[in-house]
From Swiss-Prot:
(9Z)-octadecenoate binds at R127, T128, Y129. It comes from Rattus norvegicus. The gene is Fabp3. GO terms for cellular component: cytosol; extracellular space; nucleus; sarcoplasm. Keywords: Acetylation, Cytoplasm, Lipid-binding, Phosphoprotein, Transport. The modification Phosphoserine is found at S23, S83. Pfam families: Lipocalin. This is Fatty acid-binding protein, heart. The keyword Phosphoprotein applies.
Amino acid sequence: MADAFVGTWKLVDSKNFDDYMKSLGVGFATRQVASMTKPTTIIEKNGDTITIKTHSTFKNTEISFQLGVEFDEVTADDRKVKSVVTLDGGKLVHVQKWDGQETTLTRELSDGKLILTLTHGNVVSTRTYEKEA
């Protein structure tokens, strides 16, 4: 099922992302730049390893992981987190934990689009991506 996520995805819509970043403690200037950026996400699968690359004018990040196996991650806003990604009901669920906090990034496919739902506490942001040809 993870194969369905493979491809290059371009951000086309973003809701409540500034509030999400604010809840994580991201500073004003960084939030301003990040809010204006339209990243491209590249998802690849090689055997049991999934790689998610996010490219933008703001920052490039890359993570590689196996489903259900915890790994260390440095986020785009420089948080050092323990992450685990699972496949749950056709959704890729990515949980990041640090300093007693937790945020969840859920990727799901809907009508040919990739919907990324970011949750931190009671703050929810939705970012919609379309697949590039």
